[in-house]
């Protein structure tokens, strides 16, 4: 026989319905905070239970077991351990920015130590926790029955400060989680007031007063872009970094000292992780790690080897350990019974609306209470004005009910007024007592009028909220603990993990690039160029050599007017005998695009440093180096080229320097760079030389009166001329003759300034290359033809040349002779 109490259900439907019920219960009633008071149900019940127990800051601490037992029995039937753990967290300075529970005893440590059992510890409400419950007995919030309908509990607390932002929240529900960072109380209150004063305020405006989270453990927030995104959308991520300093011991060794760790980081686990990294040789240079923390604060010491770089080790620790972490914003909270991801403005708006409701309900409660009391006093005053008649009625009545009815009829009193008259003691009949009653009545009438005015004027409600927030700020606000590192990188770049060292970058004529340690290569000063290296093919030579640092930036300018940027360490390191890597493997060059110039941009480059551009068609431009601070991986346009023009070269000009430009037809113009005003990166430029028809620019150099001007013609003739024969004139002229151009010597192949003691590398269009010393080239006048520098095969022409420091000659082992065919 089938049991009538059994109900047949579809298992699939029942599972769906039951799981949804369970999920919503966890989401709404356990894991997520309410946007109004920032509390989950367990925290709200703990505070309310402590308030009902009278465990206030002015009373002695009470056993934690008594508190958790009372909360569990009346409001939260989910086990005492979960209640105690929540209460412990509210008493930990490293968990809550402003602790809501004042704990007495062992409440754990930031090293992950657990709190003592609840039978050993004691607790009471903190002073700021009182502000969460203030006026709760004035009908400021709604109450509901508890789980067994024997008690009443609040759905939300009045919360006289925005606790959701001030103390933050974390929680994992079903299919969703919340992670809201804590903030500084004073800054958060200022943000609330700013919204109230200016409803059109933007997130950027809010960040002027509330710049970012303020974690109880301090540490550093790297950059503000992640904060802005999180405040704007409710989701985002920031980088938290330990506060560190590098100390130098008496013996000259360095040590890293950590005084603040990121929020919720266990420094004992960090200690263990560092030791493991050292043992696995993933980090080298650490000799010892010890925790010297005490009651005065955190001090975590990492000893460094004498020859190791503390900065590099520190950056590796940031990358590999929790000394640097990411905090992911997910500002999810319950609003109107629904879980929502909220922006900063939405959280502030919700709190303001809650406070308006609290103030209105409290004002209404106070008004009703004052009106009730005034009603009684009004009756007493009527009785005192007719005291003889009142006494006669009372004496003539056989019962209280008869006397009350007669008083109500005679003096038009209410039941409450007549009862108050009957309850009045004889001493209230004195004249002094009447004056007191009259005074109290007048005060109540004034209070009622004021309360009614508050209810009628929203601006007064807003002012009360702001005044009360100011009071909370005055009592409990403190200095910010977390420092916001504005403009700092959000993550570690590779260069932070690479020790800075001086290196040489070489670029060959055929486009091979490599990095060499300066210890292996005798070089010019940083920024020098043109020293011949080794490892290139017989038909190749080093055209560009730059002395730089692994951390400095190199700018690569192409014939198409584009610029690319690499850091020194991004160029592969090769030995002296290796030819290097094709530069097209590092830079996204077009098929017909080639590197014309490599410029080293040092970190300490002066503010008046300019890049001077010269094009084939005589256009020049002067642009500040700062314009090239941010360059995308695929390059940027360095100048706007017109028609079929192309970039000849780029010069790094600092201070007051002259420029000389040479043309194919043998003319040169010299002018001061200040004759070209500074222009933006995308500007086209101005005319530097007025070219004759068919003429083009073949070279440009910086020039001083101590230099010599070297010119080489296409048919192998060349000469050196002292710079003083080239007077400084205005920009845009046709130029002065710098070479006698004939059919015999050919057009100019190039022009450059030299010191006179360099070697010269010359290459022809057939691939033949020669190296010769400049001393072999005669020094002649400006308008002469020059001497034969290189014997050419029939129909061959010189296409390019560059100088090579003579100091490198023996070391490199290249003879002053023609190398032969490519």
From Swiss-Prot:
The active site is at 120 (o-(5'-phospho-dna)-tyrosine intermediate). Keywords: ATP-binding, Cytoplasm, DNA-binding, Isomerase, Nucleotide-binding, Topoisomerase. GO terms for cellular component: chromosome; cytoplasm; DNA topoisomerase type II (double strand cut, ATP-hydrolyzing) complex. A motif (GyrA-box) lies at residues 524-530. It is an enzyme of class 5 (isomerase). It catalyses: ATP-dependent breakage, passage and rejoining of double-stranded DNA. Heterotetramer, composed of two GyrA and two GyrB chains. In the heterotetramer, GyrA contains the active site tyrosine that forms a transient covalent intermediate with DNA, while GyrB binds cofactors and catalyzes ATP hydrolysis. This is DNA gyrase subunit A. It comes from Streptococcus pneumoniae (strain ATCC BAA-255 / R6).
